[in-house]
Amino acid sequence: MFKKKKIGAIDTLIDKDFVLRGNTSFSGGLRLDGKLYGDLTMEDTGGTLIMGEHSKIKGKVTVETAIVAGEIVGDIKCHDYLELQPSSIIKGDIEYN
């Protein structure tokens, strides 16, 4: 049957009260509960993005793995695994390999 993807460890946590402005890159695992106004890219393969229910990204997202429960205003490109939770809102194109 279907198997759940094993998600790696979270290396970085952005709290719900935190707002980032500008393009950002990360490596490892990122848990976003706050807001990001700018593009988000991974620095190396294996980058995992987990977005909380009240999180928001306004910009282009390029990651290996993503679990989205928040809002993305912009395009998202996932290279390996993409999971959209019922609360997710995507206002842009979705590209998945």
Please report, for each region that a protein language model flagged, where it lies by residue:
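Detector for repetitive beta-architecture
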Residues: D11, D17, N23, S27-G29, ...
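Extracellular repeat-rich scaffold modules on cell surfaces
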Residues: E43-T45
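Terminal amphipathic alpha-helical/low-complexity segments used for targeting or macromolecular assembly
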Residues: M1-I7
